[in-house]
Amino acid sequence: MVKLVKSIYTNSDVTSLGELSATDSIDQGIAGAITALTDAATITPDLNASNNFSVSLGGNRTLANPSNITAGQSGSLFITQDGTGSRTLAYGSYFKFAAGTAPTLSTAASSVDRIDYVVASATQIHAVASLDVK
């Protein structure tokens, strides 16, 4: 996990750095990179590497339970069908979707679906899918 630090300025010079406290605020946007995952039969995101991921499916795949999960972490996974399309994605047991039903991905070639997630515990990732994003 990345810790946020604050700069303390005196006459436009940084005089010290410290971690943000509960009473500090952030007045600008914070952006996280979208990290490309390697397409393989089993895809395992490393949540120490990023919060946001992308992958282009070249076949029917399994999204394994991520490594290095931390409760409270959240992010997105952008899933693109290759030029053939109709690729399926199975999900590791940590992924929990509404009503217990995992989404069926869009099937058109080059279509994009997004899965947003929040890590609820060491063994539960609450997830919501936005399908066929255009």
Model-assigned labels for residue ranges:
Residues 1-18, 131-134:
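Short, intrinsically disordered N-terminal pre-domain segments
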Residues 64-66, 102-106:
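Beta-strand-rich interaction surfaces with strong enrichment in secreted/lumenal proteins
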Residues 24-97, 111-134:
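Exposed extracellular interaction/assembly regions and N-terminal maturation sites
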Residues 15, 104, 126-127:
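A sequence-level detector of short linear motifs
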